[in-house]
Amino acid sequence: MKSFEKIKYKRLTILYFLFFIISSCKFNQSYFPHKEGKQIIYEVFFQDKENKKSNFRQSFYFFPRMENAIPVLKNDGELTFYVVQKNGIEKKSIDEFMSTGISNTKSEKNVDLLIAFPISTGTEWETNDKTTLQMKLGYDRIYNTNLPFKLTNKITEVNKTISIKGKKIKNCIKISSYGKTSYNPGPPLDNINIEVFSTSWFAKDYGLVKYKREEKSDSETMGKIIYEKTMLISD
């Protein structure tokens, strides 16, 4: 009788554990739009090192889900995949996605994670990134830096309320990120230090609702740039 009770207890424990995993998976997936044919539009603001400002829009079309992946088409023709894994939600290019397959897309490290699990304050991970600052020498020599660096990401809030054009979005995840690198172009210039700060807000059933990024250097040849994008929310 005692052995029967032990078996029953173990089965209940396993069922509870499976229920927890499934519930968590559904909870985590809700931070990205999953409706077939869903289109999302962002207003984008950019300020370059010369303090010139520009505004434009980006649109993203969500295709039907493929097992644990969501294909997304950007208005410039770029196709990417948001992949839900045990360790978080990854963003992959079509080449990365096709080389690993639909159900076997987990990275060896967290280099592609947009959101890491568990979704709780203090969760931290590193991703690969590149600088987008430009170096300007004189009037006609402009160089893209494209310097690789490690970006440290941390969930700082999980129930943040933000306002987008008067509409309150509750229970947002706030992710704060920081990275730094340096570059030595050679004489007569000294070593140039670059810092990158970014903040992302994700909301249930919306996905990324707001994003801010600032790259700054300690050299006038690079200066700093500011990039922001905000989702247009109609519903």
Predicted region positions:
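Bacterial N-terminal signal peptides that target proteins for export
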Residues: 2-14
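Intrinsically disordered, low-complexity sequence elements enriched in Ser/Thr/Gly/Pro
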Residues: 6-9, 24, 222
